[in-house]
């Protein structure tokens, strides 16, 4: 019997909490490092660590359910010989699959962190509705 670890795939899906939380596993390795935060059932935040990037070198695109973040640093004119290179500033593209009705509300870039805020906006017609339970006086008397 084979066991497949699907957690690296599920971590790219925002808003599918029950599915993602039911599958534990190791954190995916990759660039850039990021966090996915949930503040309540309708608000999420993706934070990417992008030290060395400028705001003009970043691009955020939403196409259908896919949120793609791209970064392309401008090449340095100065040639540098590194004795140790621990900071990475390379081209990347990172794609997240968003759950239904989840939309990007805003994005901010400050102190080397790109924050993308997401909000779930379910149409009122699709939201659960509470039905009041009443009594019928005529039926109780019989």
Swiss-Prot record:
- PROSITE patterns on file: SHSP (PS01031)
Q: Name one GO cellular component term.
A: cytoplasm
What does the sequence similarity comment in the record state about its family?
A: Belongs to the small heat shock protein (HSP20) family.
| UniProt gene name | ibpB
Q: What InterPro entries would the database entry show?
A: A-crystallin/Hsp20_dom, ACD_IbpA/B, HSP20-like_chaperone, HSP20_IbpB
Give coiled-coil spans as residue ranges: none
Q: State the signal peptide span.
A: none
Q: What is this protein called?
A: Small heat shock protein IbpB
One of its Pfam families is HSP20
UniProt keyword annotation of Ribonucleoprotein present: no
Subcellular location per the Swiss-Prot or TrEMBL entry? Cytoplasm
Kindly give the NCBIfam families that the UniProt entry links to this protein.
PRK11597.1
In this protein, which residues make up the domain named sHSP?
25-136
Known partners and oligomeric status: Homodimer. Forms homomultimers of about 100-150 subunits at optimal growth temperatures. Conformation changes to oligomers at high temperatures or high ionic concentrations. The decrease in size of the multimers is accompanied by an increase in chaperone activity.
Functionally, this protein is described as follows: Associates with aggregated proteins, together with IbpA, to stabilize and protect them from irreversible denaturation and extensive proteolysis during heat shock and oxidative stress. Aggregated proteins bound to the IbpAB complex are more efficiently refolded and reactivated by the ATP-dependent chaperone systems ClpB and DnaK/DnaJ/GrpE. Its activity is ATP-independent.
The species this protein was found in? Serratia proteamaculans (strain 568)
């Amino acid at each position: 019997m084979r066991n497949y670890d699907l957690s690296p795939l599920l971590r790219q899906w925002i808003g599918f909490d029950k599915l993602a939380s039911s599958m534990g596993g190791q954190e995916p390795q990759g660039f850039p490092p990021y966090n996915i935060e949930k503040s309540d059932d309708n608000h999420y935040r993706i934070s990417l660590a992008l030290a060395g990037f400028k705001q003009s070198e970043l691009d955020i695109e939403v196409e259908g359910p896919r949120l793609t973040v791209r970064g392309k640093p401008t090449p340095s004119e100065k040639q540098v010989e590194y004795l140790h290179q621990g900071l990475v500033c390379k081209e990347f593209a990172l794609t997240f699959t968003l759950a239904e009705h989840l939309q990007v509300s805003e994005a901010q870039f400050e102190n080397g962190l790109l924050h993308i805020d997401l909000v779930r906006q379910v149409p009122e017609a699709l939201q659960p509705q509470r039905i009041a339970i009443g009594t019928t006086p005529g039926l109780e008397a019989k």
